[in-house]
Amino acid sequence: MRNLSKIIFINSANIPYSETRLDGNVHFIGTQGVGKSTILRAILFFYNASPIHLGIPKEKKNFDAFYFPFSNSHIIYEVERENGVYCIIVSKSMGRICYRFVDAPYDRNWFIGLGNKVYEDWAEIRHRISESSGTQPSRKVTTFELFRDIIYG
């Protein structure tokens, strides 16, 4: 059985950095505009992999523009399965959302260096992932359909 255990935002959706564990009860409270719906939509995106059905009002920025405003904006999903944990890195490349899979638990040091500086260059991130986890990230997956096929078989 697979389950989403954690979601991480890095320079995404007006959130500089956030890790939210999802493997137990989660209760979101707060005033209007603090990010409750933002987090819930990102979780929903994991399950349906389509920015169209997220309930984002037409007068607001679209999913891509809001969640990935910078070249170093990422959402990382950590997924538990029977034989371990893997991560899905969602980011924007050449103006499109793309996914990369890493067969290892999330590590903040892959993306963030000294002084809390987020790495800009994917080559640097890829190097840090392979160096610390001993595994290479997958190639870019660039379609929602292929992402769903990989996740759900």
Locations of the language-model features?
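Extreme N-terminal "head/tail" segments of very large remodeling/mechanoenzyme assemblies
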Residues: 1-152
